Protein backbone atom coordinates (compact mmCIF):
# COMPACT_ATOMS: atom_id res chain seq x y z
CA UNK A 1 0.00 0.00 0.00
CA UNK A 2 1.06 3.60 -0.41
CA UNK A 3 -0.16 7.15 0.09
CA UNK A 4 1.27 10.64 -0.54
CA UNK A 5 2.50 12.91 2.24
CA UNK A 6 4.37 16.22 2.48
CA UNK A 7 8.11 16.22 3.17
CA UNK A 8 9.77 18.29 5.88
CA UNK A 9 13.56 18.65 5.79
CA UNK A 10 15.08 19.13 9.22
CA UNK A 11 18.30 21.15 9.49
CA UNK A 12 20.50 21.01 12.60
CA UNK A 13 18.78 22.45 15.66
CA UNK A 14 18.45 22.32 19.44
CA UNK A 15 15.63 21.64 21.87
CA UNK A 16 16.32 23.06 25.35
CA UNK A 17 15.01 22.19 28.80
CA UNK A 18 14.09 24.98 31.25
CA UNK A 19 17.29 24.56 33.31
CA UNK A 20 19.54 24.92 30.27
CA UNK A 21 17.47 27.81 28.87
CA UNK A 22 18.04 29.68 32.16
CA UNK A 23 21.80 29.06 32.04
CA UNK A 24 22.21 29.98 28.37
CA UNK A 25 19.75 32.89 28.10
CA UNK A 26 19.14 34.04 31.68
CA UNK A 27 16.69 33.07 34.43
CA UNK A 28 13.06 32.87 33.28
CA UNK A 29 14.04 33.83 29.72
CA UNK A 30 11.56 32.98 26.98
CA UNK A 31 11.82 31.86 23.36
CA UNK A 32 10.55 34.24 20.67
CA UNK A 33 8.79 32.78 17.63
CA UNK A 34 10.61 33.34 14.34
CA UNK A 35 8.28 31.08 12.32
CA UNK A 36 5.93 28.15 12.92
CA UNK A 37 7.06 24.73 11.68
CA UNK A 38 5.05 21.72 10.52
CA UNK A 39 4.13 20.13 13.85
CA UNK A 40 1.35 21.60 16.04
CA UNK A 41 2.62 24.18 18.53
CA UNK A 42 6.25 23.93 17.42
CA UNK A 43 8.28 26.80 16.02
CA UNK A 44 11.74 27.95 15.05
CA UNK A 45 12.73 30.60 17.57
CA UNK A 46 14.78 33.77 17.15
CA UNK A 47 17.25 32.38 19.70
CA UNK A 48 20.43 30.55 18.73
CA UNK A 49 23.28 28.94 20.64
CA UNK A 50 26.79 27.90 19.68
CA UNK A 51 27.87 24.28 20.07
CA UNK A 52 31.63 23.89 20.60
CA UNK A 53 33.72 20.72 20.35
CA UNK A 54 37.47 20.12 20.37
CA UNK A 55 37.42 20.22 16.56
CA UNK A 56 34.99 22.99 15.56
CA UNK A 57 31.85 24.94 16.43
CA UNK A 58 28.47 25.62 14.84
CA UNK A 59 25.38 27.74 15.44
CA UNK A 60 22.12 26.00 16.29
CA UNK A 61 18.63 27.48 16.15
CA UNK A 62 16.39 26.66 19.12
CA UNK A 63 13.10 24.91 18.34
CA UNK A 64 10.30 25.69 20.77
CA UNK A 65 8.59 25.14 23.03
CA UNK A 66 10.96 24.00 25.77
CA UNK A 67 11.21 20.25 26.40
CA UNK A 68 11.83 18.11 29.48
CA UNK A 69 15.38 17.29 28.26
CA UNK A 70 17.87 19.12 26.07
CA UNK A 71 18.40 17.43 22.70
CA UNK A 72 20.59 18.51 19.78
CA UNK A 73 19.78 17.08 16.34
CA UNK A 74 22.51 17.06 13.68
CA UNK A 75 22.99 15.43 10.29
CA UNK A 76 25.83 12.91 9.98
CA UNK A 77 27.72 15.53 7.95
CA UNK A 78 27.32 18.08 10.76
CA UNK A 79 28.45 15.55 13.38
CA UNK A 80 31.55 14.62 11.39
CA UNK A 81 32.38 18.30 10.77
CA UNK A 82 32.57 18.97 14.51
CA UNK A 83 34.17 15.61 15.34
CA UNK A 84 31.26 14.01 17.20
CA UNK A 85 30.22 10.37 17.10
CA UNK A 86 26.50 11.13 17.35
CA UNK A 87 24.32 8.00 17.21
CA UNK A 88 21.31 7.68 14.92
CA UNK A 89 18.39 7.62 17.34
CA UNK A 90 14.67 8.27 17.63
CA UNK A 91 13.86 11.63 19.17
CA UNK A 92 14.04 11.47 22.95
CA UNK A 93 16.45 8.51 23.01
CA UNK A 94 19.50 10.41 24.21
CA UNK A 95 21.03 8.06 26.82
CA UNK A 96 24.78 7.65 26.27
CA UNK A 97 24.71 9.92 23.19
CA UNK A 98 27.31 12.57 22.33
CA UNK A 99 27.92 15.75 24.32
CA UNK A 100 29.53 19.16 23.75
CA UNK A 101 29.83 22.66 25.19
CA UNK A 102 26.82 24.92 24.57
CA UNK A 103 27.25 28.70 24.66
CA UNK A 104 24.46 31.26 24.86
CA UNK A 105 24.39 35.02 25.46
CA UNK A 106 24.07 34.63 29.25
CA UNK A 107 26.24 31.60 29.96
CA UNK A 108 27.58 28.23 28.92
CA UNK A 109 27.28 24.61 29.96
CA UNK A 110 28.83 21.24 29.24
CA UNK A 111 26.12 18.96 27.82
CA UNK A 112 27.13 15.43 28.86
CA UNK A 113 24.70 13.68 26.49
CA UNK A 114 21.86 14.67 24.19
CA UNK A 115 23.40 15.04 20.72
CA UNK A 116 21.94 12.65 18.15
CA UNK A 117 21.35 12.21 14.45
CA UNK A 118 17.55 11.97 14.37
CA UNK A 119 16.23 8.81 12.74
CA UNK A 120 13.90 9.54 9.83
CA UNK A 121 10.27 9.40 10.83
CA UNK A 122 6.74 10.23 9.74
CA UNK A 123 4.25 12.17 11.87
CA UNK A 124 0.60 11.22 11.35
CA UNK A 125 -2.69 12.57 12.64
CA UNK A 126 -4.55 9.73 14.43
CA UNK A 127 -7.20 9.83 11.68
CA UNK A 128 -4.60 9.38 8.93
CA UNK A 129 -2.94 6.49 10.77
CA UNK A 130 -6.31 4.79 11.25
CA UNK A 131 -7.33 5.37 7.61
CA UNK A 132 -4.21 3.56 6.38
CA UNK A 133 -4.08 0.90 9.10
CA UNK A 134 -0.93 2.26 10.73
CA UNK A 135 -0.15 2.84 14.39
CA UNK A 136 2.47 4.61 16.47
CA UNK A 137 5.71 2.61 16.35
CA UNK A 138 5.14 0.96 12.95
CA UNK A 139 7.98 1.02 10.41
CA UNK A 140 7.37 2.11 6.79
CA UNK A 141 9.40 3.21 3.74
CA UNK A 142 9.51 6.59 1.97
CA UNK A 143 9.62 6.58 -1.82
CA UNK A 144 10.79 9.73 -3.61
CA UNK A 145 10.50 10.64 -7.29
CA UNK A 146 12.67 12.62 -9.68
CA UNK A 147 16.20 12.42 -11.10
CA UNK A 148 17.55 11.17 -7.79
CA UNK A 149 14.53 9.17 -6.67
CA UNK A 150 15.22 6.87 -3.75
CA UNK A 151 13.46 4.54 -1.36
CA UNK A 152 14.35 5.27 2.27
CA UNK A 153 13.76 2.33 4.60
CA UNK A 154 13.20 2.04 8.36
CA UNK A 155 10.98 5.10 8.82
CA UNK A 156 9.33 5.23 12.25
CA UNK A 157 5.61 6.11 12.42
CA UNK A 158 4.77 8.64 15.13
CA UNK A 159 0.98 8.90 15.35
CA UNK A 160 -1.03 10.85 17.88
CA UNK A 161 -2.94 14.01 18.66
CA UNK A 162 0.26 16.11 18.82
CA UNK A 163 1.31 15.11 15.29
CA UNK A 164 0.43 16.51 11.85
CA UNK A 165 0.93 14.56 8.60
CA UNK A 166 4.57 15.13 7.58
CA UNK A 167 7.69 13.06 6.86
CA UNK A 168 10.90 14.28 8.51
CA UNK A 169 14.32 13.58 7.01
CA UNK A 170 17.55 15.47 7.57
CA UNK A 171 19.53 17.61 5.14
CA UNK A 172 21.86 14.75 4.16
CA UNK A 173 18.92 12.55 3.16
CA UNK A 174 17.15 15.41 1.36
CA UNK A 175 20.30 16.29 -0.59
CA UNK A 176 20.74 12.63 -1.62
CA UNK A 177 17.21 12.75 -3.12
CA UNK A 178 17.57 16.36 -4.39
CA UNK A 179 14.38 17.33 -2.51
CA UNK A 180 13.26 20.30 -0.43
CA UNK A 181 10.60 20.80 2.22
CA UNK A 182 7.06 20.99 0.88
CA UNK A 183 7.30 18.41 -1.90
CA UNK A 184 5.19 15.27 -1.85
CA UNK A 185 6.67 11.82 -1.28
CA UNK A 186 4.99 8.43 -0.84
CA UNK A 187 4.72 6.29 2.27
CA UNK A 188 5.03 2.64 1.19
CA UNK A 189 4.21 -0.32 3.44
CA UNK A 190 2.80 -3.83 3.57
CA UNK A 191 -0.20 -4.68 5.76
What positions do the PLM features span?
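Extreme N-terminal starter segment of soluble prokaryotic enzymes
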Residues: 2-4
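Short beta-strand-centered segments at strand-helix junctions
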Residues: 6-8, 13-53, 60-105, 110-137, ...
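RNA-contacting regions in translation and RNA-metabolism proteins
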Residues: 186
Amino acid sequence: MQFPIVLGVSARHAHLCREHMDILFGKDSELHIKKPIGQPGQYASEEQITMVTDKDSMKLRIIGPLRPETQIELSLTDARKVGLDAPIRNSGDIAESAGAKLIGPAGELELKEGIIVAARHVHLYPETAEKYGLKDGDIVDIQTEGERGLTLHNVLVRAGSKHADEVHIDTDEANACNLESGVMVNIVYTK
